[in-house]
Amino acid sequence: ETSLQQWRFSHDKLREQALHSLSSEERIELHACIAQSIEKIYPGDAGRASQLALHYREAQQLTKAAHFYGEAGEVALRRGAPGEAAVLLEQARTLHSQVAQPRLAEIRVWRGLTEANFGLGRLREAESALRHLCMLGGIPLPTQSAHLLSMIARVGASLMGSRVGLF
C-alpha cells in the first residue's frame, strides 16, 4: 500500500520480492540511504546501532558497519544479553579483520567478547578473547591454567560486581 508517496509493506513476501527486483547497485544505495536516514532521525541513539550496522554492511560501508556492530554489542552487554552481544561483537571482529580500525575500537570489541563469552560460560573462548585483548594492550597473561582461571574469575567477578553496583 502507498501513503503520501511512501511504500508500506504489510507482508514480508512482498517486501522480499520488491528487494529482489532491485539491482545490486540499487540495493546498496537503498541500504546506504536507510542508514543515513536512521542516523539523521535518531542521532546518537545507541539502541539503533544494530540496525545501522546491518544497513551499513549491506551498503558495503564496512568501516561504519564495524563501528556500529561494536556499539550494538556493547548495548547488548549492558542489557544483560551476552548471547546477542557475542554475535554482534563477532561481526565487528570479522569486519575489523577486513578494514583498518583504531586500536581502541579493537580493544573494546575484544573486551566485549571476553565479557560475553564469560557470561555464557564459554571459558575457553573467554580465555582466548582475554589473551587477545591483553596482547593488544601489551599486558602478558599467565601461561599456567590455574593462574589464568583465577585471573578470569577475578575479572568476571569484578565485571559482575560493577553491573550490580557492588564496585
Placement of each model-derived feature along the sequence:
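Short secondary-structure boundary elements
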Residues: 1-84, 94-96, 136, 140, ...
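N-terminal alpha-helical targeting/anchoring segments
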Residues: 74-97, 107-117, 121-122
